[in-house]
Amino acid sequence: MGGDISRPAVANVHVLSDFRLRVEFDNGETRIFDAKPLLQGPWLGMLKNFGFFDCAFPNGRTVEWLEGQTIEPDVLYDESVAIAED
């Protein structure tokens, strides 16, 4: 089966300003993901409408939007920045 490393699943997501997501993972980590670089092309580009972007929700593994757009779990985790909890 190779060396697949399982990423934590998304437990909750909060939309922040400037197309960023505050993502809470099931391992207790909270990370900030900047989605702006991904909002290109006809499919993910639809999310440039902040009213649509604001409808992000956890789908059990990653973040999803109403039309079915998702961010690959590896990208969401690896390209996000951990934040310190109080």
Feature annotation, model-predicted:
Residues 1-86:
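Motif-centric detector for short Cys/His coordination patterns
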